[in-house]
């Protein structure tokens, strides 16, 4: 059923090899193991109301998002949560490399 959580997936959402402008509205990604969202070779996208939540047990080392080789990405109203059971502090929310013109 769409919308039901699938625990222990390494990545919750992948967008790759897209140059055509696109939009995402009000997406919530929660409780994945490695990365909530992964963007690779993406350009000209706008993302509105993106929410991330990391669970204590499933994702103590999980990153909210990773972007590589992306350009012209705009993110508006991004929320990053960790549940109270996530006892480890988090230094990095988004890992970004080889990208241009990424705005939050």
Put a short name on every predicted segment.
Residues 1-104:
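Extracellular/periplasmic carbohydrate-active domains that bind, remodel
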């Amino acid at each position: 059923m769409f919308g039901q959580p699938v625990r222990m997936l390494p990545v919750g959402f992948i967008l790759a090899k897209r140059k055509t402008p696109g939009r995402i509205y009000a997406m919530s990604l929660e409780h994945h193991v490695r990365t909530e969202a992964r963007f690779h070779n993406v350009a000209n996208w706008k993302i509105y109301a993106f929410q991330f939540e990391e669970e204590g047990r499933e994702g103590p080392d999980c990153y909210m998002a990773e972007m590589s080789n992306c350009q012209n990405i705009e993110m508006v109203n991004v929320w990053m949560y960790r549940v109270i059971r996530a006892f480890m502090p988090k230094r990095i929310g988004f890992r970004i490399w080889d990208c241009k013109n990424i705005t939050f």
